[in-house]
Amino acid sequence: MAATTTMATLNLPSLTSHPNSSTFPKHPQPLQFPFRTTTNPISLSSTRTTRLRPIAAVEAPEKIEQLGTQLSGLTLEEARVLVDWLQDKLGVSAASFAPAAAVAAPGAPADAAPAVEEKTEFDVSIDEVPSNARISVIKAVRALTSLGLKEAKELIEGLPKKLKEGVSKDDAEDAKKQLEDAGAKVSIV
């Protein structure tokens, strides 16, 4: 990039001129400002650019800076291909970095039986609806879900069917209670 100095002239009205005279003096006084700009030799227009490094910038070798510049210029598709290639080349997978990949706690014996995880997500399934309780069960299904009348009716016709999937234990128990109060036989899976 080539640095150039540009001189600009500003014509200002003279303060010594008579108040009744025109606003522009007969003899303008030039005022020159040096401007420093950087120009791109490829383009014909000049641009003014100021490049500052961040205060907390880490000094890195030239090779690392070039690599970082190349990586930041990748498209999302190119980045995905790069990740796949690195996983294959290095023999790692993204799943190995997941927090679910737990490590044995310090001080715990290595041969101890793993703790049984308590189930946190439940499915509510309607098993049976007596014919005399169909209307009240349809109302309960509509209250528990955002289904319309037709969809709720179709849901209770071909049983057993899951009403809710992946809900908390409290929500599952609440739904079961409401449906059983309406007359349906319900199970939580």
Swiss-Prot record:
Keyword flag Methyltransferase: no
Matching CDD domains: Ribosomal_L7_L12
Record field: compositional bias (Basic and acidic residues): 165-183
Transit peptide, residues from-to: 1-56
Annotated Gene3D superfamilies: 3.30.1390.10, Single helix bin
Family named by the database record: Belongs to the bacterial ribosomal protein bL12 family.
Record's protein name: Large ribosomal subunit protein bL12c
Taxonomic lineage of the native organism: Eukaryota, Viridiplantae, Streptophyta, Embryophyta, Tracheophyta
Gene encoding the protein: RPL12
